[in-house]
Amino acid sequence: MAKKIVGFIKLQVPAGKANPSPPIGPALGQRGLNIMEFCKAFNAKTQGMELGLPIPVVITAFADKSFTFIMKTPPATVLIKKASGVQKGSAKPHTDKVGTLTRAQAEEIAKTKQPDLTAADLDAAVRTIAGSARSMGITVEGG
């Protein structure tokens, strides 16, 4: 018989930097889950990734105080800012442009994000990433 699910916890945790301090500690503590067990498992899974890159994670809490977690790909905005060398997006995205993103960079981000996007193919995923970049005030070259 399957375990009874008590709830889901959605967090964004920096890769390799999970520790019991907020927001992780209180979120897991409310459900009675072992905080250090999650931190060790998460840090081990994110070992090969860039340190500090925010990783969305969905933790499934079970009635017997056990848990499983699924890691998603980093947010598109973070990847776009990193690729274009921008600290933050524009306050007026359609009038003030803050950076540029090439088609090749957009394709690279789309390949990274492909598992989490609903796009049918790579070209549709690139258009999704390009749209996100434009809404941040970043010009997309060649697309």
From Swiss-Prot:
Domain of life, per lineage: Bacteria
MF annotations from Gene Ontology: large ribosomal subunit rRNA binding; structural constituent of ribosome
PTM summary: One or more lysine residues are methylated.
Alphabetical UniProt keywords: Methylation, Ribonucleoprotein, Ribosomal protein, RNA-binding, rRNA-binding
UniProt KW rRNA-binding keyword: yes
Gene Ontology CC: cytosolic large ribosomal subunit
CDD domains linked: Ribosomal_L11 (cd00349)
Matches recorded under PROSITE patterns: RIBOSOMAL_L11
Record GO biological process: translation
Self-association and partners: Part of the ribosomal stalk of the 50S ribosomal subunit. Interacts with L10 and the large rRNA to form the base of the stalk. L10 forms an elongated spine to which L12 dimers bind in a sequential fashion forming a multimeric L10(L12)X complex.
Family, similarity comment: Belongs to the universal ribosomal protein uL11 family.
Protein function: Forms part of the ribosomal stalk which helps the ribosome interact with GTP-bound translation factors.
Name of the protein in its database record: Large ribosomal subunit protein uL11
Organism: Bordetella pertussis (strain Tohama I / ATCC BAA-589 / NCTC 13251)
